[in-house]
Amino acid sequence: DSLSEDNWKFVVSSSCETILEILDIGGCAKGVAEYT
């Protein structure tokens, strides 16, 4: 389980810095995929 809750929060905050980016699921998922 390399992706702990804290790491996940970091990924989300880094990949989806704004509410609009969070709502942009495609962009958010792409950022998470690139991180992992």
Swiss-Prot record:
Main localisation: secreted
- Any one Gene Ontology cellular component term annotated for this protein: extracellular region
Q: What does this protein do?
A: Scorpion venom phospholipase A2 (PLA2) that impacts angiogenesis in vitro and in vivo without showing any cytotoxic or apoptotic signs. The antiangiogenic effect is independent from the catalytic activity and seems to be held by its small subunit. PLA2 catalyzes the calcium-dependent hydrolysis of the 2-acyl groups in 3-sn-phosphoglycerides.
Q: What name does the UniProt record give this protein?
A: Phospholipase A2 hemilipin-2
Is Secreted found in the keyword set? yes
**GO:BP terms for this protein?**
lipid catabolic process
Which species? Hemiscorpius lepturus (Scorpion)
Q: What cofactor does this protein call for? A: Ca(2+)
Name the family the entry cites: Belongs to the phospholipase A2 family. Group III subfamily.
Sorted keywords for this record are: Calcium, Cleavage on pair of basic residues, Disulfide bond, Hydrolase, Lipid degradation, Lipid metabolism, Metal-binding, Secreted, Zymogen
What the record notes about the co-factor is: Binds 1 Ca(2+) ion.
EC number(s): the record gives 3.1.1.4
Reaction(s) catalysed by this chain, per the record, are:
a 1,2-diacyl-sn-glycero-3-phosphocholine + H2O = a 1-acyl-sn-glycero-3-phosphocholine + a fatty acid + H(+)
The domain of life for this entry's organism is: Eukaryota
Tell me the tissue specificity: Expressed by the venom gland.
